[in-house]
Amino acid sequence: DYHLLDTASELKRTGTSTNIGFFLHIPFPPLDIFAKLPWRAEILQSMLDYDLIGFQTLRDRRNFIQCLRTFIDDVSIEGKGQVLSARAGDRSIRIGYFPISIDYDEFSQMAGSKEVADAAWYIHEDIPKGKIVLGVDRLDYTKGIPYRLRAFESFLEKHPELHRKITLVQVVVPSRRDIPVYEDLKIEIEQLVGEINGRFTRSGWVPIHYIFRSLTRPELLGYYRTAEIALITPLKDGMNLVAKEYCASNTEQTGALILSEFAGTAPQLKKGAILVNPYNIEEVSEAIYSAWSMDIRERRTRMKRMQGTVAKHDIYWWVNSYLKASTAGNLDDFPPVGYIEPV
């Protein structure tokens, strides 16, 4: 997304006079990181040529505003809701945060289909005993997969009584294989899987099932339905829709979600998910045990909360709120901070 930060400036140089909006899907860096860029002021000045800038989270918007106040002269900020107004010289733009989402109804309905039920049956045939812990990520260093594998290894070390009663299914979707660092990451992941399976595998039980390919939609939803625990622990993520997809597809409402506090989804789902620091291997290990031992009533209570949040703030809400921000006449038309994601 950062490739498009100065697109508005380029468009206006060509004579474009219509309003231009921009949405940043990735996190906006905090001041101490952004300050290191040689072109920091130029980037911010270019972004001020947009009429509306949208971010995923309140934290991202705060980071951007802090950078504006530090590197752009005479900036004033008005408003205190979901959408603010920023003035710098003769420019006035709107800055909002709009957590992107999914089509909740589509996932929920498809998860209840016969096709997905058949996929779930085959998964149960392949992993007939114990609970399934699911990780689904594209191949990327930001996803924290090696940390996650180490956390699962720690869990197995601490809880030998649960061997044969729990299995981690780690799906890795191929990405950027032509870049050496990604190929190195793949090798690291596969070596870790091999080491852990080598230590703990017993007759009739392999602790980690590693899948390196893209899944079809029915396959993916089949895993969402069968997994009692979703382990979503990116080191940093703009949003992470896997967490929302898992909630929408959990038709029995018995799943537990372990979620990185550094995922953009965390503020929205924190009342139902078990939040963890993905760098803290022991904390994630303990979270796996907490999720494994959680009683069914608490699972349902937590999942219902998360499903309600995702259903209310779905992809159509995201589109409508962004479009409203570009056309509404008054900042008071927008909900106060905390309505979308508690702070």
Where are these predicted regions, by residue range?
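Catalytic cores of carbohydrate-active enzymes across secretory and cytosolic contexts
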Residues: 1-343
